[in-house]
Amino acid sequence: MKCLLLALGLALACGVQAIIVTQTMKGLDIQKVAGTWHSLAMAASDISLLDAQSAPLRVYVEELKPTPEGNLEILLQKWENGECAQKKIIAEKTKIPAVFKIDALNENKVLVLDTDYKKYLLFCMENSAEPEQSLACQCLVRTPEVDNEALEKFDKALKALPMHIRLAFNPTQLEGQCHV
Protein backbone atom coordinates (compact mmCIF):
# COMPACT_ATOMS: atom_id res chain seq x y z
CA MET A 1 0.00 0.00 0.00
CA LYS A 2 2.86 2.37 0.85
CA CYS A 3 4.45 1.64 -2.54
CA LEU A 4 1.16 2.38 -4.32
CA LEU A 5 0.82 5.72 -2.53
CA LEU A 6 4.45 6.55 -3.27
CA ALA A 7 4.00 5.71 -6.96
CA LEU A 8 0.82 7.80 -7.13
CA GLY A 9 2.55 10.71 -5.41
CA LEU A 10 5.51 10.53 -7.79
CA ALA A 11 3.23 10.39 -10.81
CA LEU A 12 1.38 13.49 -9.64
CA ALA A 13 4.58 15.31 -8.73
CA CYS A 14 6.19 14.55 -12.08
CA GLY A 15 3.11 15.66 -14.00
CA VAL A 16 2.51 12.42 -15.85
CA GLN A 17 -0.31 13.22 -18.21
CA ALA A 18 -1.80 11.14 -20.96
CA ILE A 19 -3.50 13.01 -23.77
CA ILE A 20 -6.88 11.42 -24.25
CA VAL A 21 -9.61 12.63 -26.58
CA THR A 22 -12.86 11.32 -25.18
CA GLN A 23 -15.30 13.21 -27.39
CA THR A 24 -15.74 11.82 -30.89
CA MET A 25 -18.73 12.11 -33.16
CA LYS A 26 -21.27 9.32 -33.00
CA GLY A 27 -22.54 7.94 -36.31
CA LEU A 28 -20.16 9.70 -38.70
CA ASP A 29 -21.28 9.34 -42.35
CA ILE A 30 -17.93 9.33 -44.13
CA GLN A 31 -19.53 9.93 -47.56
CA LYS A 32 -20.94 13.28 -46.38
CA VAL A 33 -17.51 14.67 -45.42
CA ALA A 34 -16.27 14.32 -49.00
CA GLY A 35 -15.24 17.49 -50.77
CA THR A 36 -13.31 20.71 -50.42
CA TRP A 37 -12.40 22.09 -46.99
CA HIS A 38 -10.41 25.06 -45.64
CA SER A 39 -8.42 25.16 -42.39
CA LEU A 40 -10.01 27.97 -40.34
CA ALA A 41 -8.28 27.35 -37.00
CA MET A 42 -5.62 25.08 -35.50
CA ALA A 43 -4.58 24.21 -31.95
CA ALA A 44 -1.90 21.96 -30.47
CA SER A 45 -0.72 20.57 -27.17
CA ASP A 46 2.87 21.57 -27.98
CA ILE A 47 3.76 25.00 -29.37
CA SER A 48 6.47 23.55 -31.64
CA LEU A 49 3.84 21.63 -33.63
CA LEU A 50 2.37 24.86 -35.08
CA ASP A 51 4.63 27.82 -34.23
CA ALA A 52 6.42 28.20 -37.57
CA GLN A 53 5.16 28.10 -41.14
CA SER A 54 7.02 24.80 -41.62
CA ALA A 55 6.07 23.32 -38.21
CA PRO A 56 5.30 19.56 -38.34
CA LEU A 57 1.51 19.77 -37.97
CA ARG A 58 0.88 23.13 -39.59
CA VAL A 59 -0.95 21.57 -42.49
CA TYR A 60 -3.80 22.96 -44.55
CA VAL A 61 -6.50 20.44 -45.41
CA GLU A 62 -7.68 20.84 -48.98
CA GLU A 63 -9.98 17.89 -49.60
CA LEU A 64 -11.39 14.77 -47.96
CA LYS A 65 -12.14 11.74 -50.15
CA PRO A 66 -13.76 8.57 -48.81
CA THR A 67 -12.36 5.43 -50.46
CA PRO A 68 -14.43 2.40 -51.52
CA GLU A 69 -12.88 0.48 -48.59
CA GLY A 70 -14.26 3.00 -46.07
CA ASN A 71 -10.92 4.73 -45.49
CA LEU A 72 -10.44 8.49 -45.77
CA GLU A 73 -7.96 10.05 -48.19
CA ILE A 74 -6.82 13.44 -46.89
CA LEU A 75 -5.28 15.87 -49.38
CA LEU A 76 -3.35 18.66 -47.71
CA GLN A 77 -0.77 21.34 -48.27
CA LYS A 78 2.33 21.82 -46.09
CA TRP A 79 5.37 24.10 -46.23
CA GLU A 80 8.58 22.11 -46.81
CA ASN A 81 12.01 23.42 -47.77
CA GLY A 82 10.65 26.93 -48.32
CA GLU A 83 7.85 25.94 -50.67
CA CYS A 84 4.34 24.59 -50.56
CA ALA A 85 4.08 20.83 -51.05
CA GLN A 86 0.99 18.70 -51.58
CA LYS A 87 0.61 15.59 -49.43
CA LYS A 88 -1.83 12.71 -49.44
CA ILE A 89 -2.56 10.76 -46.28
CA ILE A 90 -4.67 7.62 -46.07
CA ALA A 91 -6.57 7.40 -42.80
CA GLU A 92 -7.63 3.78 -42.29
CA LYS A 93 -11.05 3.06 -40.86
CA THR A 94 -11.37 1.46 -37.44
CA LYS A 95 -14.28 -0.14 -35.60
CA ILE A 96 -15.23 3.33 -34.37
CA PRO A 97 -16.72 5.36 -37.28
CA ALA A 98 -15.16 8.70 -36.24
CA VAL A 99 -11.66 7.32 -35.52
CA PHE A 100 -9.07 6.56 -38.20
CA LYS A 101 -5.56 5.12 -38.00
CA ILE A 102 -2.73 6.92 -39.79
CA ASP A 103 1.01 6.55 -40.12
CA ALA A 104 1.99 10.05 -41.21
CA LEU A 105 3.16 13.35 -39.74
CA ASN A 106 4.33 11.38 -36.67
CA GLU A 107 0.69 10.90 -35.68
CA ASN A 108 -1.22 7.66 -35.27
CA LYS A 109 -4.91 8.61 -35.09
CA VAL A 110 -7.36 11.04 -36.66
CA LEU A 111 -10.49 11.64 -34.59
CA VAL A 112 -13.54 13.49 -35.91
CA LEU A 113 -15.01 15.46 -33.01
CA ASP A 114 -17.99 17.06 -34.73
CA THR A 115 -19.39 18.07 -38.12
CA ASP A 116 -22.61 19.32 -39.64
CA TYR A 117 -21.28 18.09 -43.04
CA LYS A 118 -22.36 21.31 -44.81
CA LYS A 119 -20.37 24.03 -43.02
CA TYR A 120 -17.74 22.74 -40.58
CA LEU A 121 -15.74 19.72 -39.41
CA LEU A 122 -13.66 19.51 -36.22
CA PHE A 123 -10.92 16.89 -35.99
CA CYS A 124 -7.79 16.05 -34.01
CA MET A 125 -4.60 14.18 -34.86
CA GLU A 126 -3.21 12.27 -31.92
CA ASN A 127 0.15 10.66 -31.23
CA SER A 128 -0.20 8.48 -28.14
CA ALA A 129 3.28 6.93 -28.37
CA GLU A 130 5.56 7.53 -25.38
CA PRO A 131 7.33 9.87 -24.75
CA GLU A 132 6.22 12.13 -27.62
CA GLN A 133 2.50 12.30 -26.81
CA SER A 134 0.93 15.14 -28.74
CA LEU A 135 -2.39 16.40 -30.00
CA ALA A 136 -3.23 18.84 -32.79
CA CYS A 137 -6.76 19.83 -33.78
CA GLN A 138 -8.30 21.77 -36.65
CA CYS A 139 -11.54 23.50 -37.48
CA LEU A 140 -12.35 23.03 -41.16
CA VAL A 141 -14.97 25.00 -43.10
CA ARG A 142 -16.42 24.48 -46.58
CA THR A 143 -15.93 28.08 -47.75
CA PRO A 144 -12.95 30.40 -47.17
CA GLU A 145 -14.91 32.64 -44.79
CA VAL A 146 -14.80 33.03 -41.04
CA ASP A 147 -17.59 30.97 -39.46
CA ASN A 148 -18.13 32.16 -35.88
CA GLU A 149 -20.42 29.23 -35.05
CA ALA A 150 -17.73 26.77 -36.13
CA LEU A 151 -15.08 28.66 -34.12
CA GLU A 152 -17.31 28.60 -31.02
CA LYS A 153 -17.78 24.83 -31.36
CA PHE A 154 -14.02 24.42 -31.87
CA ASP A 155 -13.21 26.45 -28.75
CA LYS A 156 -15.77 24.48 -26.73
CA ALA A 157 -14.24 21.16 -27.89
CA LEU A 158 -10.75 22.39 -26.98
CA LYS A 159 -11.65 23.29 -23.39
CA ALA A 160 -11.29 19.66 -22.28
CA LEU A 161 -7.96 19.22 -24.09
CA PRO A 162 -4.41 20.31 -23.09
CA MET A 163 -3.87 22.93 -25.80
CA HIS A 164 -1.01 25.43 -25.57
CA ILE A 165 -1.20 27.20 -28.94
CA ARG A 166 -4.16 28.24 -31.10
CA LEU A 167 -4.13 29.86 -34.54
CA ALA A 168 -7.14 31.30 -36.38
CA PHE A 169 -7.20 32.65 -39.91
CA ASN A 170 -9.18 35.53 -41.44
CA PRO A 171 -10.62 35.32 -44.99
CA THR A 172 -7.51 36.89 -46.57
CA GLN A 173 -5.26 34.41 -44.75
CA LEU A 174 -7.55 31.53 -45.76
CA GLU A 175 -7.18 32.50 -49.42
CA GLY A 176 -3.42 32.89 -49.00
CA GLN A 177 -2.79 29.54 -47.31
CA CYS A 178 -0.19 27.27 -48.76
CA HIS A 179 -1.35 26.31 -52.29
CA VAL A 180 0.51 24.25 -54.88
Curated annotation (Swiss-Prot):
Keywords: Disulfide bond, Milk protein, Retinol-binding, Secreted, Signal, Transport
Post-translational modification: Alternate disulfide bonds occur in equal amounts.
Its job: Lactoglobulin is the primary component of whey, it binds retinol and is probably involved in the transport of that molecule.
Signal sequence annotation: 1-18
Consequence the record notes for mutating H38Y: In lactoglobulin 2=A and 3=C
Record protein name field: Beta-lactoglobulin-1/B
Source organism per UniProt: Ovis aries
Key word Signal present: yes
